[in-house]
Amino acid sequence: MPNDDQAQAAFDNFVQLWTTGTTAGRRAPILRRPDEVGLEYGDVFFPSMDGVPLEGWFIPADSDRLIIHNHFLPGNRYGYPGHLPEFGGLGGFEVNFLPEYRALHDAGYNVLAYDIRNHGMSGQGNGGITGIGLLEYRDVIGSLRYAATRRDTKNMTKVLLSVCLGADSTAVAWSKHPDEFAEIKAMVMLQPVSGRYIVEEFVKSIGMDDGYEKFDRAVH
């Protein structure tokens, strides 16, 4: 169990991560590119539903099927450099989505992977504040509209692969704008986040008895 100073430092870092999607104030960098695993790709950019500029990759395959990938917090389209000391504290290991994209490509899927607002190379939205899906759903809508209007993807069979923050964002988007999902044939949502449970378990792990109340005051 950490001492009081260590617990407070961990708590402060957790609040910053939760509210801004950054680690110690830094966005996670994009360390890898699809060509590292032998994939051709193109850089793409398109607007969110509310106009925030989003950047990503389009990885083409010889098929009429498309997967749109929505990443987790505090990662990006590449994954997360948790193996680097300055981005540690989340398990200490790297998350690398590129082998996953390679497997999807080899299975016959085109892939659209992009950075959610305030992550990666995408623009800042809402003053840099993270909404755990309540704001980022607009980016999911933006990606759907982009895929629906892009000449080579508009007639493709479309599937969503959404992780953590991406899953929450997808769920909120689907709830608010179900008509935007008319062309979605399947959806995989990995680890959608229940905010209260995560906060309660975190403050318990650092021995902060009044941690949930402190967290609630810190973010409101």
Please tell me what each predicted stretch does.
Residues 25-66:
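N-terminal cap/lid segment of alpha/beta-hydrolase-fold proteins
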Residues 73, 115-119, 193:
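Short beta-to-alpha linker loops that shape the active-site pocket of alpha/beta-hydrolase fold enzymes
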